């Protein structure tokens, strides 16, 4: 094996172990932060497909918070971005060098982004601590994520970061939709399915931001969400399998549409920003009423399961002690078994040696007898 490949594999294993340790650390801190939960600032995690205008939309949010005299705090989690149109208070690029990660681990672009995010997640408890110290002075924390949406939404590091935020502050996920491209019913349904998967994976309030309304009005999307018959009429002319599937899904997603907030925005003109922040405030209240209670219940369940596991282990140890009648409980008998085996092998060797000695002595006696017989014959 190439030494460089072996070193790279070892680095990846160490990175994975750090990620697991970080997750355990964040879970412990989350369990102890229930009483220290802060109602402000509101964390806004912005996600979206590549090309949906996510970074431009975040830039507009930064400008709006400045114009409205609100206090915002910006966190950039995209290690591959060359330049940002806004200043980031916390930038992953200051901690992790994306191109160096690609060289060191022999990775491609997507693997480099994922590994950079993993490395940053191992220290994310420090990021939360920094925001906690400034919590009383902030209204919003705006979080920009990598352009490859699946790297954040479906990775362990993305789950760590989301859970760390949600366990300490009111957290809302914003899914940015490319409105002109979603004018196709099939593309619209694909976007809605992805938004639905994010909602159920994060278990956090979700706000749909239909971006680029300066190019295409988003009213058609709202109509499709409010009345499935309008959507079915739009897709009626298409007889393909995907159209039939989308037609069926429009009924299944009706309940999903009722439980999310949707707004039309324009990152270029700034239209819809007031409505967006109203939706964020309403989602933060929903978080405190519904999602926070669910989060506390899940924490309690984890703690209960952990206590049950500890009790089970203690009970098992107690039974082992009783069965040994106060003697030492041998947890690993490998050495004992090995010593017994070695002793048995030595005894077998001694027996073989004795047998060989007896055979040699018998041979010697036989030779003496033959000599005597020979002498007697010649005499």
Swiss-Prot record:
Protein name as catalogued: GPN-loop GTPase QQT2
Transmembrane parts of this sequence: none
GO cellular component, one term: phragmoplast
Gene (name only): QQT2
EC id: 3.6.5.-
Organism of origin: Arabidopsis thaliana
CDD domains: GPN1
Basic and acidic residues bias (residue ranges): 303-322, 335-346
Disruption-associated phenotype: Embryonic lethality due to embryo development arrest at the octant stage.
Keyword list, A-Z: Acetylation, Coiled coil, Cytoplasm, Cytoskeleton, GTP-binding, Hydrolase, Nucleotide-binding, Nucleus
């Amino acid at each position: 094996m190439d030494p460089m490949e072996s070193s790279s594999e070892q680095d990846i294993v160490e990175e994975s172990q750090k990620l697991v340790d970080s997750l355990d650390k964040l879970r412990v801190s989350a369990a102890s932060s229930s009483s220290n939960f802060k109602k402000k600032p509101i964390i806004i995690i912005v996600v979206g497909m590549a090309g949906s205008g996510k970074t431009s939309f975040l830039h507009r949010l930064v400008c709006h918070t400045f114009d409205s005299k609100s206090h915002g705090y910006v966190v950039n989690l995209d290690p591959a971005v060359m330049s940002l149109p806004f200043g980031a208070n916390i930038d992953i690029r200051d901690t992790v060098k994306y191109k160096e990660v690609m060289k060191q681990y022999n990775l491609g672009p997507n693997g480099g982004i994922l590994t950079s995010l993993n490395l940053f997640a191992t220290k994310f408890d420090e990021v939360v601590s920094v925001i906690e110290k400034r919590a009383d002075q902030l209204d919003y924390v705006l979080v920009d994520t990598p352009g490859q949406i699946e790297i954040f939404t479906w990775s362990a590091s993305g789950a760590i970061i989301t859970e760390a935020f949600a366990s300490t502050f009111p957290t809302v996920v914003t899914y940015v939709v490319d409105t002109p491209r979603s004018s196709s019913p099939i593309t619209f349904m694909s976007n809605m399915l992805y938004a639905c998967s994010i909602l159920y994976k994060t278990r956090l309030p979700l706000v749909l931001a239909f971006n680029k309304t300066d190019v295409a009005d988003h009213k058609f999307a709202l109509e499709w969400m409010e009345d499935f018959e309008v959507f079915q009429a739009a897709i009626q002319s298409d007889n393909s399998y995907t159209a039939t599937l989308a037609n069926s899904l429009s009924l299944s997603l009706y309940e999903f549409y009722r439980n999310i907030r949707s707004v039309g925005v324009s990152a270029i003109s700034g239209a819809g920003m007031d409505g967006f922040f109203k939706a964020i405030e309403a989602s933060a209240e929903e978080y405190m009423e519904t999602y926070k209670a669910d989060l506390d219940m899940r924490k309690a369940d984890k703690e209960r399961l952990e206590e049950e596991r500890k009790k089970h282990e203690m009970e098992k140890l107690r039974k082992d002690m009783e069965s040994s009648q106060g003697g030492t409980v041998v947890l690993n008998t490998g050495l004992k078994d090995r010593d017994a085996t070695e002793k048995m092998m030595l005894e077998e060797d001694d027996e073989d040696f004795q047998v060989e000695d007896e055979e040699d002595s018998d041979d010697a006696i036989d030779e003496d007898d033959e000599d005597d017989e020979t002498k007697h014959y010649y005499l």
